[in-house]
């Protein structure tokens, strides 16, 4: 990314309820000076779809939070996708139960699963090879 300070800055803000989290997310991005244009860049929102549970169970990433983040990045020109690979059920089943699938449908962004890993080989580094989900590349 163009902003070198991005990896060095963190903003922690409180929101009394998910319905109003978009404003806090925007404030947080301003606090870390995330002002990059994302025009045409791919952004994968990696959610936590631990199981096929509704948002009220607080098991998965809340769909209101996912919607807010996705909308902000879409407005900045990003090509957003949302994904995960739950261990207990399929991504589609967990996303439907959690409300994440509705967010994807409403915003026209793809829901991707991480069930198709591809090998990655590096010349240098601690790990010379590993597998990563195809949508992450």
Task: Describe the predicted segments one by one.
Residues 1-137:
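N-terminal and secondary-structure boundary signal
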């Amino acid at each position: 990314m163009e902003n070198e300070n991005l990896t060095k800055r963190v903003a922690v803000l409180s929101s009394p309820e998910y319905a109003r989290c978009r404003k806090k997310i925007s404030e947080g991005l301003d606090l870390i000076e995330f002002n990059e244009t994302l025009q045409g860049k791919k952004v994968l929102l990696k959610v936590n779809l631990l199981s096929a549970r509704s948002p009220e169970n607080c098991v998965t990433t809340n769909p209101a939070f996912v919607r807010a983040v996705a909308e902000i990045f879409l407005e900045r020109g990003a090509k957003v996708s949302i994904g995960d690979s739950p261990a207990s059920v399929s991504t589609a089943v967990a996303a439907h139960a959690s409300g994440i699938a509705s967010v994807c449908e409403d915003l026209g962004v793809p829901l991707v699963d991480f069930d198709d890993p591809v090998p990655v080989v590096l010349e240098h580094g601690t790990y010379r090879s590993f597998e990563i989900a195809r949508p992450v590349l």
